[in-house]
Amino acid sequence: ELVEYLCAALEKEKLFVWGGSWGTELGTYLCFRYPEHIAGYVGSGQLVNGVLNEELSYDFAMDEAKKAGDTKAVSTLERIGRPVDGCYREVFKGMMAQRRIMKKYGGHSMNKGTYWTDTALPLLRSREFSFTDKLGLALGYKRCLTYMWPTTSKCDFPRECTRFAMPYYIFQGAHDNNTPSALVQAYYDAIEAPDKDLIW
């Protein structure tokens, strides 16, 4: 309905869809299930398989922490445990703990900043959002991940979505271990589309 509304409002027959990280799950399902008004898809930080994604991301964080002799990080990862069916025991807390360690060792980007310095602090300093907006974003993010992640982690695109009626493009970081690049190449190879490209 939203795509049809936007096409009418913008007086366009078709729109391009862009998804980043979790948005690649939404975008891929949208393009696969409702291709009529989609001109093309562009994804970055492409999700491929929710369960394998989390397992590989956890393993990367654990391996890097062990190599660095970071006993505190290893202990944290052992405490939260390897994800089961793509989810940590304490969904939000476990995921955030793993993501902090994964990011610390360059698994999110080559910038080894923290979520605090790279995400939270710039948001807090932003003049574009009110205090209420910022609080709502933080609480909404936590609530959203806590309740939606068990469903989100069930996606398996190589099994569910490989044939597309529109061009399908992926921009992926070669060192990405948040949405592991190790899964992306095999998925890309399986995709059938009028045009496709994987840009590293």
Residue ranges, per PLM feature:
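Active-site signature of alpha/beta-hydrolase-fold catalytic machinery across serine-
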Residues: 5, 29-33, 186
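Conserved alpha/beta-hydrolase "acid-adjacent" motif
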Residues: 177-183
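Short beta-strand/loop motif that positions the catalytic acidic residue
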Residues: 164, 170-172, 176
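Conserved acidic catalytic loop of the alpha/beta-hydrolase fold
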Residues: 2-14
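Catalytic histidine neighborhood in serine/cysteine hydrolases
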Residues: 189-200
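Conserved alpha/beta-hydrolase "nucleophile elbow" surrounding the catalytic nucleophile
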Residues: 15, 19-24, 173
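Alpha/beta-hydrolase
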Residues: 62-159, 166
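A catalytic-pocket lid/entrance helix-loop region that shapes and gates access to the active site
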Residues: 25-84
